Amino acid sequence: TNYAGQILMFNNPRDSYGIALKKLGYSQNTTNRDELDQATDELKKQKLLIQAYVMDEIFPKMTAGEAALAPYYAGDAVTMIGDNPDLDFVVPKEGTNRFVDAMVVPKSSPNKDLAEQFINFMLEEDVALANIEYIGYSTPMSNVKARLDEEVQNSFSYPDDEVLSRCETFVNLDEETTAYLQDSWTGVLSYGDSSIGDILFLAVFFLFLIGIVIYFTVKKHRNHTI
C-alpha cells in the first residue's frame, strides 16, 4: 500500500496471470481452474493499487519517474537504468518468466536462402557483439559475452543458476484455458467499475430529487405570495 497509485501492470492476461500465479507459488503454465481463480482474486486486490495497465508505455513512464514499480523486460531495463540511474531491476524471490527471442524463417518464405544468410550474418562474432551492445539484451554466444565490458555482464542480464532455477518459460496453453484466462482478465479489468457507476447513478438521482424538492418549494412559495 506504500506504492498505491504508483504501480504499473502489464495489460495482457498471460503476463499478468503469470505474475499472480508465481506469487501464489503456482506454475505460470497451470491449467488448474482453482489456481487460476485464486490468481484472479489476487489481481482484483492488486487493481486497487494500480496506476495504469500498460505495455510499451512502461518504458517512458518509469524512465520519467512517473511510477515507482513495474514489471518489464531485462534487456530494456538496461537502457532504462542508463536513462534514469534511480531505477533498479530485481527478480522476485518467487521467480519470473524466462523468455527467449529468436530469429526464424517462415516455411513459406520465397527468399529462404537470403533469410538464412542474414541470420548467419547476425551470428558473426563482431556483428553479434555490436547488436548486443546496442539493444542491451543478453547473448547466448559465449565468445561474444566474453568480449562485453564487465558492467554489461551484470547480474540481471546474465543471472546465475540459482536465479534461473526459479524461472519458467511460457508454453502455449490449450484453447479452452486461453479463453478462460481472457474472460477472467476481462473480469479483472472491469472489477470495481460497476460500484463506481452505481455511486455516480445514486449521486445524480439524489441531485435530481433535491432539484424537484427545491422546484416545488419555490413554486409553493410563489403561489402563497400571489
Q: Where do the language-model regions lie?
A:
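Mature extracytoplasmic/periplasmic domains
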Residues: P106-R166
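Conserved C-terminal helix/tail region of periplasmic/extracytoplasmic solute-binding proteins
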Residues: E162-I226
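Periplasmic-binding protein-like
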Residues: L36-K44, D83-K107
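Extracytoplasmic ligand-binding site segments that recognize negatively charged/polar headgroups
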Residues: T1-E66
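A ligand-binding cleft/hinge motif common to bilobed small-molecule-binding domains
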Residues: T63-A64, L69-D86
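Short, hydrophobic alpha-helical packing/hinge segments within bilobed ligand-binding/sensory domains
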Residues: I58-K61, A77, A115, A128
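Ligand-binding "clamshell"
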Residues: T79-V91, E150-S155
